[in-house]
């Protein structure tokens, strides 16, 4: 592993603070996220400096990261989550998440909050700590750890009326990989009629292909729902050309109106984000 890595934590911290001030409806979740960030940053640095062996990762994280995650959650999280994490079989949750097992929301939150920064620090070696045989269609999974996609990201193209190429962000190790804009990232569906895109406006979500009052600016000009009626899955899609300051994994946490609208349409994400949405 290279000893040099660009730390993502300052940008995440700054963006979370900005979005918390801008979107009060996401304040509780972003407050918890801001309290978690120092814990995750410390885990990232320690894993970069002395990477744990893959077979030792659950025990390493349970001893050295998990207690601080629980402390931060009890201090700043919603009461129901704080109570739930106290009763979790934490190391079992960590093992299960690395294996791709279905976990209840509190276990999944603890595992992601604890292991996410460590796997991100391990980079290409993260896959050796994970079950890489997950899912029937391997082409839709992370090439590093075979985790599920969390976000769709459109790169800035340099042109005001066009977006750049698309990549997906892994929910497990934070790696990214290329994906065609004309397919569903969850199931590979390519028929245009089965793929839907919705953007958020002050008066409610509308089709990105038309509709709305045309007078009020979007609440999330750089975010939209990319959904599929074949598998009933969706991802939040971040257009970096519309907001170069966006930090995709942070901006997704503030996109609650989009998630609620998608749920009303019968859509679910391949996997919930860190905060369960």
Residue spans for each PLM region:
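Cys/His-clustered metal-coordination modules, chiefly Zn-binding fingers
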Residues: 123-263
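N-terminal alpha-helical interaction blocks
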Residues: 1-132
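C-terminal membrane-proximal segments flanking the terminal transmembrane helix
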Residues: 258-274
